Structure formats: C-alpha cells, structure tokens
Curated annotation (Swiss-Prot):
It catalyses: Hydrolysis of proteins to small peptides in the presence of ATP and magnesium. alpha-casein is the usual test substrate. In the absence of ATP, only oligopeptides shorter than five residues are hydrolyzed (such as succinyl-Leu-Tyr-|-NHMec, and Leu-Tyr-Leu-|-Tyr-Trp, in which cleavage of the -Tyr-|-Leu- and -Tyr-|-Trp bonds also occurs). Keywords: Cytoplasm, Hydrolase, Protease, Serine protease. The gene is clpP2. Fourteen ClpP subunits assemble into 2 heptameric rings which stack back to back to give a disk-like structure with a central cavity, resembling the structure of eukaryotic proteasomes. GO terms for cellular component: cytoplasm; endopeptidase Clp complex. It comes from Mesorhizobium japonicum (strain LMG 29417 / CECT 9101 / MAFF 303099). NCBIfam families: clpP, PRK00277.1, PRK12553.1. It is found in: Cytoplasm. PROSITE patterns: CLP_PROTEASE_HIS (PS00382), CLP_PROTEASE_SER (PS00381). GO terms for biological process: protein quality control for misfolded or incompletely synthesized proteins. Pfam families: CLP_protease (PF00574). One of its GO terms (molecular function) is ATP-dependent peptidase activity. This is ATP-dependent Clp protease proteolytic subunit 2.
C-alpha cells in the first residue's frame, strides 16, 4: 500500500519563475514561504512541528520586523508538538498572523488564538473546537497515577494559555473546555479566540498621483 503522505507530496504543484539566471522551479509551499506564508495542515505531531518551527525561525532571520502569516487547517494532535510551535511563535520577533481555513480543533485552536492581537482571523465556514487534553495510559497503578497528575497539570497550563489570549476568566475557560466545544467563526470571535471573520481580502489602496 502506498504511503499517503508520499502520494500527496507527489501531487504538490511546481511553480516556475523567470530569473536573471533563467527559469527556477519551486514547489508551491516553498514559493509561498518566500511570501512569508506557512501552513499548518493535518495532525499536529513532532515532524510537522519541527518543520513549522524551522520555517518560523528562518523567516525571523530573513526579516525580524516583517509579519508572518500562518494558515491553519488542523484537527489538533500531540500537545507537546503544538506547544513547541506555540513557544516558537511567542519567542520570535516578527508578529505572527493566524488564519483558520477549514478547521482549527484542539491544539489547532490554541495555535489559532496564539496569533498576534488583532491579527487572528477565520473564514466564514471555518470550524473551531476547544477541549481539555486527553490521554490513555496503562501499566502499574503508581505510574497511571503519575500520568494522571501530569495531565491535570497540563490541563491547567493549557487553560492559562487560553485565558491569556482570549481575555476570559480561568473559570469560564475551564467550563468551556470541559467537553468538546464546537464553534462557528462568529462564535469564536465572540469568545475571543479570533479577532475577525474575513471572507475576502481587503482591496489594495489606490495609489495617489
């Protein structure tokens, strides 16, 4: 059976540009990276997090004053992988704008709300879901107890991140995240996860002669 990731990568379009040295071909994501656009697509895991963090650091080195645009369409995934991306977003100098297209669930929603204030967006048909972390453990009773204590600490830390970026009280965040909580783009805006719902690009300002 073919690896679906390998099949997908073989379908990534190539873009050909004319340069003073002739033609140069880029895969579409590398070309968009030149425009300071990064995609978080699919499950959040270590491999993807490494690539996203590397791109963020590269763009910071290129220009520490120019904003970075993060497009998110993710069902969430591994908490530690998501927190690696989150910490890198907060660490670098450029402002990071986030835009949800499709869905931003679980860790995807945390990364969405972690964008720079007034630069967190979602398209009208996007879906956002927040919930508390989950985990499954087996082994000796003492080990299970330690894992349970750790996930409680993790839950508390994630709640604090949502409090920081939404402006909601800790109690309201804890209550909302107690179960899977789905939101439309407008509901996510009202909750403070994003700043604006956008359906089209704002027209460029006309040049003044």
């Amino acid at each position: 059976m073919k690896n679906p990731v390998e099949t997908y990568m073989n379908l990534v379009p190539m873009v050909v540009e004319q340069t003073n040295r002739g033609e140069r071909a880029y895969d579409i994501f590398s070309r968009l990276l030149k425009e300071r656009i990064i995609f978080i697509t699919g499950p959040v895991e270590d491999g993807m997090a490494t690539l996203v963090c590397a791109q963020l650091l590269f763009l910071e080195a290129e220009n520490p004053k120019k904003e970075i645009n993060l497009y998110i369409n993710s069902p969430g995934g591994v908490v530690t992988s998501g927190m690696a991306i989150y910490d890198t977003m907060q660490f670098i100098k450029p402002a990071v704008s986030t835009l949800c297209i499709g869905q931003a669930a679980s860790m995807g929603s945390l990364l969405l709300t972690a964008g720079h204030k007034d630069m967190r967006f979602a398209t009208p048909n996007a879906r956002i879901m927040v919930h508390q972390p989950s985990g499954g453990f087996q082994g000796q009773a003492s080990d299970i107890e330690r894992h349970a204590m750790d996930i409680v600490k993790l839950k508390r830390r994630l709640n604090e991140v949502y409090v920081k970026h939404t402006g909601k009280s800790y109690e309201e965040i804890e209550r909302t995240l107690d179960r899977d909580h789905f939101m439309t783009a407008d509901e996510a805006k009202d909750f403070g996860l994003i700043d604006k719902v956008i359906s089209s690009r704002e027209p460029a300002e006309s040049a003044v002669a």
